[in-house]
Regions:
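N-terminal targeting/docking segments
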Residues: 2, 21-26
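Primarily secretory-pathway and cell-envelope proteins
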Residues: 26-86, 123, 136-194
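Mid-length scaffold segments of soluble, non-membrane domains
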Residues: 86-138
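Preference for short coil/turn "hinge" residues that link or interrupt alpha-helices
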Residues: 13, 71, 81, 91, ...
């Protein structure tokens, strides 16, 4: 009889624990944004910026962008986390890199085939952002040397209908526009092969 009672107690405990665990997971998924400071080291909070790749082709030649995509995670992004008027790595972790098998025209810039680093210079609403193509490669994203700039070109801004949680870099209009989207902003620049 004691064995049956212990088994019943164990089964009841497991059922209760799984019910509470499911409720706990649901509560974590639907919890509102915290109102105070958030620690990166809180259990069950993954603030990673996964490595992403975006590519297009011109005349069967590939152009690939490698970047790390940060998440908003209830933070104010532009003007705070990403300050206006300061060069931004345009992602997270290592520098955002463009590798092209063909010479490109990016906005007003003539970019030779090869590997380059992309930065942006965010501006307050109403002023154009600048896309920066830099010749230095392989560095961490916060390392920037202006003397290595190939050049800067203005971008076109538009507002997204809903906030985008994770930053993305995509090719649109059959690969002829490069878009950087995050939060409620969509910054774009035309790209063509030379």
């Amino acid at each position: 009889m004691k064995t049956r009672s212990r088994c019943s107690t164990l089964l009841l405990t497991l059922a209760l624990a799984s019910t509470l665990g499911a409720a706990s997971v649901h509560a974590q998924e639907s919890a509102p944004c915290p109102t105070g400071p958030v620690s990166m080291y809180q259990p069950n909070h993954t603030l990673t910026s996964p490595v992403q790749m975006s590519f297009t082709q011109f005349n069967k030649k590939t152009v690939t962008i490698y970047y790390s995509a940060p998440s908003k995670f209830c933070r104010k992004i532009f003007g705070t986390l990403v300050p206006f008027g300061e060069v931004w790595r345009t992602g997270a972790n290592p520098s955002t890199t463009i590798v092209s098998e063909v010479p490109l025209k990016i906005g007003t810039l003539d970019v030779p085939a090869g590997t380059h680093t992309l930065y942006t210079l965010p501006s307050a609403p109403g002023k154009p952002w600048l896309l920066i193509v830099n010749n230095e490669t392989g560095q961490w994203g916060t390392v920037y040397h202006q003397e290595q700039d190939l050049g800067r070109t203005p971008m076109t801004a538009s507002t997204l209908p809903t906030s985008q949680e994770r930053m993305s870099i995509t090719w649109e209009k059959k690969g002829t526009e490069l878009h950087i989207r995050w939060d409620n902003l969509d910054e774009s620049v035309p790209v063509s092969a030379q």
